[in-house]
């Protein structure tokens, strides 16, 4: 990568099943070199300030993961992000066995727990 080439920045919230789903796909697809991972730790002092910055870029409340896909262009929604990177790489998300396993077994259980803990912020993507 040349010095001026843009590298997407992925803001992944620790403990977030949606962030983990995106990370599972990117890892399994061999695409981790396309993103810079920013670990968002809810208990870190700068978490809320960084989240507020992301909200300003998005123009709405933040849901994770958030990826700066192009300079100044931010996208959320794990499924849309997976579809985007899969299409760019000529891959089919459902053909990824680890991602499929996660989505069919572990992910639904995590969503159930997430909805109990965060009833107002839970989503289904």
Identify the residue ranges that each predicted region occupies:
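Local sequence-structure signature of Cys/Sec-based thiol-disulfide redox active-site neighborhoods
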Residues: 1-39, 43
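Thiol/selenol-based redox catalytic cores and closely related redox-interacting motifs
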Residues: 42-125
């Amino acid at each position: 990568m040349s010095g001026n080439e843009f590298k997407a920045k992925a803001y992944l919230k620790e403990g977030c099943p949606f962030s983990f789903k995106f990370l599972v796909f990117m890892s399994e697809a061999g695409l981790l070199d396309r993103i810079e991972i920013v670990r968002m730790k809810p208990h870190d002092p700068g978490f809320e300030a960084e989240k507020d910055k992301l909200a300003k870029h998005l123009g709405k409340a933040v849901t994770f993961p958030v990826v700066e896909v192009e300079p100044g262009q931010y996208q959320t929604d794990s499924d849309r992000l997976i579809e985007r990177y899969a299409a760019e790489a000529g891959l089919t998300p459902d053909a990824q066995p680890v991602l499929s396993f996660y989505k069919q077994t572990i992910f639904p259980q995590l969503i159930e727990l997430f909805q109990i803990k965060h009833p107002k912020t839970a989503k289904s993507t």
